[in-house]
Regions:
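Alpha-helical multipass membrane-protein architecture
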Residues: 1-669
Length: 669
């Protein structure tokens, strides 16, 4: 057949390194780093990068893109004859870099908008600044992972499973069935596109249904809301009922307990005073509903405190792993140098260490020299030094942790919080604790977050390459290409979404970015309602002591219920499908999971497109394309003889039924 039999991933051989045989033997030379592989990888990086930004701002979470990209690549590259498994691997490698960089960007850089009024963070929320920080962080994550590859991927093969990387290799090796798998993903994309187009663009039915009690009710200002979106159903199906239930329980506490309680105890005049003290204008307050006023004045900070404490708990829990990772990985540099001369095989060629060092120094120089980034000369020099120190620390940690627990469980938020706390304390100790240095501290946190996120993805991709017989240096250059290409669209997506709908609004609450801003402001300005933040921290600690995941619960406590309830519903749909199918655990390659992945991709990409429609002016600038399209739907809804909320539930229930139908199918892959 021309290739070696792949080693088993399920059992641990006595000497995994010696017995490992990649799918493509090292002595074989097959097409790998080709133009079509780079082109498709870049395209997927752009698409999944934009999709990830949308989802991260909306729900504070992301979905791994490597397996969906591998599935789609296998199908699309079949258009070209003689497409190889190594070309498909390059496609998913480049594409996954876009998704991981987008996650790091969306979790941190929008925090520029939420810093103290005197910090001037908005001035650095520009396309050029976003693109620069994203590119520096993403490339740094790739570079710092290079000297660790031999230690973590090769020497610890059989010890560090790298679950997503191994699963992706299995997908590539099972490429004969790629057409069926890709059809399921494309089907989900098509269904979500049509649904979202009719729903969000043409407004043929409401985007959300809600119930709010009156201020005079027994339970005043209680609110239940459900956003009728395909992407949230897909996310919920992927996460499952347990995580979805934990998330919605946080929203239940906020909107059905805390806000009604505050409504009974806090007078309207006091709420007004507190909002004005937080910097809200009277005009903005007048435009808020009563529930929104209580959320902006109080529960938003309770949620931020909960997320902060949850991140700290996650960091403390992983501290033994972090210490062990550092101890076991610090020898990787010398190990890679010692083995470099003997590495003659194609499958052992890494990017030269000299290039890594030169690249890291060059990135630090870019940070210190560019005027588009925050801080004076001293601030930028400190930013460059702290970026290198914290960057190498948490790239090392992230690269090892994802090998043990997978990228989905990587405590990126905790690492970023630790970076922000350390950076802010360094600045304060040097007398640079004013508001003007908040954007500088946040920039360090953003770069480290992006680097750690991309290092985790890089590790999984290199594990996939190790199993299928890829050339590491080609993957590493592919990752750099994926980072650079995706940064162009990531910045545009953030700009469009903020300009069209407003980041920080109910539509895009950006919970992770709000958390990062809270940490920076808390250390450097002390101008925060600490009482409510500490209440949230105490609640998260209580939830953890009850044996529940504090981060999922805390994110739910911060998010609007309109975001968490549909995720829970999606999880319930998976539970129903599992019961119907008679299988407890569903494979990532099952019809239901692949269809749900398509729903997420189709829904989020169409959501990004709506922001573009919003930016296209019509009627001489008095209107826009999205408003005109939604006007057609409003005219249609006015003719309907039934309640509009009931009408909106009909297509949503049909979509839910379709998800169950796809989920109950037996896995044929």
């Amino acid at each position: 057949m021309g290739h070696a039999e792949p080693s088993s991933h399920s059992s641990k051989p006595s000497d995994p390194v010696a017995e490992h045989k990649p799918f493509i033997a090292p002595e074989q030379v097959v097409p790998e780093f080709t133009f079509k592989a780079i082109l498709f990888g870049s395209l997927f990086g752009i698409l999944f990068g934009a999709s990830t930004v949308y989802l991260a701002l909306k729900a504070g979470l992301t979905v791994s893109a490597s397996i969906p990209i591998a599935v789609l690549s296998i199908s699309l590259l079949r258009i070209f004859k003689r497409a190889t498994i190594l070309e498909n691997n390059i496609v998913q490698t480049i594409g996954s870099a876009g998704e991981s960089v987008a996650a790091g960007v969306a979790f941190t850089i929008p925090a520029m908008l939420f810093l103290s009024p005197g910090a001037g963070g908005e001035a650095y929320f520009t396309y050029a600044s976003i693109m620069t920080l994203a590119a520096v962080g993403g490339i740094l994550g790739v570079l710092f992972m290079v000297p660790l590859r031999r230690s973590l991927i090769v020497k610890e093969h059989g010890t560090l499973p790298y679950p997503e990387g191994t699963a992706c290799a299995d997908v590539l090796i099972a490429g004969e069935k790629g057409g069926k798998m890709a059809g399921l993903v494309f089907g989900g994309v098509a269904v979500a596109f049509v649904y979202k187009l009719l729903n969000s663009v043409f407004a043929m039915w409401h985007e959300a249904v809600a119930w709010v009690s009156k201020k005079t009710a027994v339970l005043p200002n209680a609110k239940v809301e459900n956003e009728l979106s395909p992407e949230f159903l897909g996310v919920g199906y992927i996460l499952g009922p347990k995580i979805g239930g934990i998330m919605v329980s946080g929203s239940v506490l906020t909107f059905l307990v805390i806000i009604p309680l505050l409504s009974m105890l806090v007078a309207d005049t006091r709420v007004m005073e507190d909002l004005l003290a937080l910097g809200y204008t009277q005009a903005k307050i007048d435009g808020m509903s009563e529930v929104t006023r209580y959320r902006e004045a109080y529960t938003r900070y309770i949620g931020a405190g909960a997320v902060t404490m949850a991140g700290i708990i996650t960091l403390i829990k992983t501290m033994p792993t972090i210490v062990r990772s550092l101890r076991e990985s610090m020898g990787a540099l010398s190990g890679s140098k010692a083995g470099a001369g003997a590495a003659q095989l194609r499958t052992e060629r890494d990017m030269p260490i000299a290039w890594v060092a030169i690249g890291a120094v060059a990135l630090a120089g870019i940070l210190a020299a560019l005027p588009i980034l925050p801080g004076g000369l001293m601030g930028k020099l400190m930013m460059a030094v702290l970026m290198l120190v914290f960057g190498f620390l948490f790239v090392t940690v992230s690269s090892r942790i994802v090998g043990l627990i997978g990228s989905s469980s990587n405590p990126i938020s905790g690492m970023t919080i630790a970076t922000l706390l350390g950076t802010a304390l360094v600045f304060v100790s040097m007398g640079m604790g004013g508001e003007a240095y908040q954007p500088v501290a946040l920039s360090v946190g953003a770069i480290v977050c992006i680097a750690a996120a991309n290092a985790g993805a890089t590790s999984q991709d290199l594990k996939t390459g190790y199993l299928v017989g890829a050339t590491p240096i080609r993957q590493q250059w592919g990752l750099v290409i994926g980072v650079v290409v995706s940064t162009f669209v990531i910045g545009l997506t953030l700009q469009f979404l903020h300009g069209s709908f407003g980041i920080g609004s109910d539509k895009f609450p950006a919970p992770q970015a709000t958390l990062m801003a809270t940490v920076v402001k808390g250390v450097m300005s002390q101008n925060l309602p600490w009482g409510y933040i500490l209440v949230g921290a105490g609640l998260a600690l209580m939830i953890y002591m009850c044996g529940v995941s504090p981060l999922a619960w805390a994110v739910g406590a911060y998010l609007p219920m309109g975001a968490t309830l549909p995720i829970f519903i999606g999880g319930c749909l998976r539970w129903v499908a599992d019961k119907w199918r008679g299988e407890k655990d569903e494979s990532e390659l099952s019809p239901g999971m692949l269809f749900a992945t398509g729903l997420v991709a189709g829904g989020t990409l169409t959501g990004v497109a709506t922001s573009v429609f919003k930016a296209v002016p019509t009627d001489g600038g008095n209107s826009d394309l999205l408003t005109d399209a939604q006007g057609l739907g409003a005219s249609f809804q006015a003719l309907l003889p039934i309640d509009l909320s009931l009408w909106a539930l009909i297509p949503y229930l049909l979509l839910a039924a379709l998800v169950i139908y796809m989920g109950k199918k037996k896995t044929q892959i």
